[in-house]
Amino acid sequence: MINIRFPDGSIREFEAGVNSLDVAKSISPSLAKATMAAYIDDQLKDAKDAINSNCELRLITVKDPEGLEILRHSCAHLLAHAVKELYPNTEVTIGPVVDNGFYYDFSFKESIGEADLPTIEKKMKELAKKSAPISYRVVPKAEAIEFFKAQGENYKVEIIDSIADEQMKIYTQDNFSDLCRGPHIPNTSVLKAFKLTKLAGAYWRGNSDNEMLTRIYGTCWATKEDLEQYLNMLEEAEKRDHRKIGKVLDLFHFQEDSPGIAFWHDNGVRIWRQVEDYMRASNNKYGCSEIRTPLIADFSLWQKSGHASKYAENMFATKSENRDFAIRPMNCPTCVQVYNTKLHSYRDLPIRMAEFGIVHRNEPSGSLHGLLRVRSFTQDDGHIFCTPEQVEEEVILMVQQCFEVYKDFGFNDFAVKIALRPENRIGDDETWDKSEQMLKNALDANNVSYELLPGEGAFYGPKIEFHLKDAIGRSWQCGTIQLDFSMPQRLGATYIDKNGEKQVPVMLHRAIVGSLERFIGMLIEHYAGNLPLWLAPVQVAVMGISNNQDDYCKEVFIMLEKNGIRAKLDLRNEKIGFKIREHTLLRVPYLVILGKNEQEQKIITIRKHSGEDLGQMSVDDFCAFLDKQIQAKE
């Protein structure tokens, strides 16, 4: 007999060889039905793995994040199973879990398109209903190679060759087998709420020299209700797509002459200026001086900073006068050069610098996505040089600034996470202990709850991440606060301490909105293009019922502009209904409509974008009304 301890501290006795599914059944049939896998002494295992000794057991159900991930991973296998049934000559490659779903890459021998997805999905449902048990066997590497080679799965053979382990896991359901670390669900009947969503191309191992594979994306959920809710969200997201809205509102465009780099139009630049000016004022409030540094630097600087070894493939390089240069992928090294121009005392610290720095990264063309994934973007970078004793206080201020910014832009629901030390890192454990505790203390001081992400920090320091939730429930990673013990030392940054000796400052990297391009894309989708008044590219459209009001329209327009209102004058010889409809589609917050009565009484009639009639008032009163709304960031 063995003793199994449960999360509530209770201990129960079972026969040796029992599995987690049996344990779940002994508690309740419903729990057994919901069990996906289990943690046995902190190791994630299949639900049917035998337990032969005393242990601590935590059952994983579909309600747990790990359970949902396992469900989705098993659904990826179901997709591969269905594809092999329908297209037997297809080679399977990899099928990982991604946010809200999964994908699987295939090498098809025949042409396949979006129209084929319903057929594949139908086959998946047929296979799931078979309730085929899912099991695995562990075999020597050579045997696994022979197994997949015999099936003509050359990609699987290549994957196995690249793995150092001498033992391989092969999972089987019905007549389909796949290489996988697992764990997986007990049987296919659990898979009831899934949907194939799209098809795309993807190079094998992300290398454009390799074969272009077909990537099929899908989503999978614990219940059909959850699936329906997610699909509704996708439908709403499609309506909010910033690329479509950007075209309608004449904000920006992309073209093949400059892939991944936006062409900003007047309306888009107006939004950009509001975001940048707001951030500049926020930085001034928090004591940041503003700098501007070169986009191009000698390649030796990137070698010193470490970017050459880690980012070389993503950097744009050029030559001039027999020298190698690179366009910067990050702003940090050039910021350090500004710091290094002076001798600093500990009394000078902290030194806070901010920069709206343009960076370029050679992202794969297949990953580019409107403003959300580009090759050139402007980062609202901040870099703080301080003593170790000042770190906590500086982080407290940065957290406060982040919260203020997000709330002013209309993001009131966000999650905060701390990425902790990775396995490969610089610095001793004592330094990491102190650093991680400083970040925790800073969040505690702001009464912020947070999630810990073990192993996800950078090799040079832990970081705080801010994840914003938008109007339709999507989460966007936005700001970061990063401790850095490496770059100041690599680039020779120093200060003189109170004993007259040189010390290396701690460098804090902070980005609040991050990429301005991406943040504006987020704002467009969050508000579905109906930006709040203070951000709207055109705040008021002025129009007359007939051309008899043209002079008065011009007069009102000039008064609005003198009061700092971004107004548009529409004197076209069109019916008033047409003008109202057009400016409503353009998401202009307020429409000023002028007729004979308004002209004679020197008043204006105001209509909101929503269609609400605000009645009549003087231009001065309207300007005061708008100013109050703008100042309140409404």
UniProtKB/Swiss-Prot annotation:
Cofactor note: Binds 1 zinc ion per subunit.
Keyword Flavoprotein: no
Cofactor(s) demanded: Zn(2+)
Region: Catalytic, residue numbers: 241-532
Keywords of the record: Aminoacyl-tRNA synthetase, ATP-binding, Cytoplasm, Ligase, Metal-binding, Nucleotide-binding, Protein biosynthesis, RNA-binding, tRNA-binding, Zinc
A family per Pfam: tRNA-synt_2b
Chief place where the protein resides: cytoplasm
Function: Catalyzes the attachment of threonine to tRNA(Thr) in a two-step reaction: L-threonine is first activated by ATP to form Thr-AMP and then transferred to the acceptor end of tRNA(Thr). Also edits incorrectly charged L-seryl-tRNA(Thr).
EC number: 6.1.1.3
SUPFAM superfamilies: Class II aaRS ABD-related (SSF52954), Class II aaRS and biotin synthetases (SSF55681), TGS-like (SSF81271), ThrRS/AlaRS common domain (SSF55186)
UniProt record similarity statement: Belongs to the class-II aminoacyl-tRNA synthetase family.
Keyword match Metal-binding: yes
Protein name: Threonine--tRNA ligase
NCBIfam families per UniProt: thrS
A GO term for molecular function: metal ion binding
TGS domain span: 1-61
Residue positions binding Zn(2+): C332, H383, H509
Catalytic activity: tRNA(Thr) + L-threonine + ATP = L-threonyl-tRNA(Thr) + AMP + diphosphate + H(+)
PANTHER family: THREONINE--TRNA LIGASE, CHLOROPLASTIC_MITOCHONDRIAL 2 (PTHR11451:SF44), THREONINE-TRNA LIGASE (PTHR11451)
Annotated GO biological process: threonyl-tRNA aminoacylation
Location(s) in or outside the cell: Cytoplasm
Gene that encodes the chain: thrS
